Amino acid sequence: MHEMIQEYAKRLKLSWIRENFHTVDIEDPKQYLLTLFEKEVNQREERRINLLLKTATLPNVSGKPFDWSEVQLGQGLSQESIIEGKFIEEKENMIFYGGVGAGKTYLSSLIAINAIQKYGRRVKFYTVASLANELLEANEKGTLNKLFKKIDKLDLLILDELGYIPLHKQGAELLFQVISMCYEKRSIIVTTNLQFGKWNHVFGDPILTEAVVDRLIHHSHLLLFGGESKRMRESMMLKN
């Protein structure tokens, strides 16, 4: 009987029950079944969360609490609402602006981890350069639509380090397609060390740059890192 239970559990893909059914006390048959199914569901959920974390390709996070002391929040934002990802529910974007080492990448990673672990959301982390390269490679291989479909399933796309490396013309155009595809359908976090007026250095085309900025800042929030001045916020306000 023991072997038959294991075999049936294996066929039904009830891995926790298969390995542990004999360790649960049998006092009440209904409670016994409830306990087995609860454990099975919990294990499946844990595996799902671990898979989401793996596929998100997030940078390593130390686990230290985030230091908000040098971060200026946009209107209507709170630390809790940012970490809880309220903007993801509303399909809004976040622009994190500040110098190197100001904590932009770290905060975006904390938001992503919470979104995955607490809400089971689909997240993907890219540097802008790595996504552009992946898009170019997929285009050459004829698998661009496959990559687009993967991005289309996301709840949150993180684009890190915008401004560090100028993009190839075709890479910039493909990245614009991704941003347009996400517009009002899923949230994007962009981390950057450049004011909007200098994004043309990355995209290399004033018209394309303006289109990118317009789609990103519509329904978006701005966070200033490292005690930056109000110039970035003012430039954003002029765009609205």
Question: Which positions does each model-derived feature cover?
Answer:
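Active-site catalytic microenvironments for nucleophilic, acid-base chemistry
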Residues: 39, 114-118, 181
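Walker A/P-loop nucleotide-binding motif
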Residues: 91-107
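Post-Walker A helix-loop "phosphate-sensing" segment adjacent to the P-loop in P-loop NTPases
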Residues: 112-126
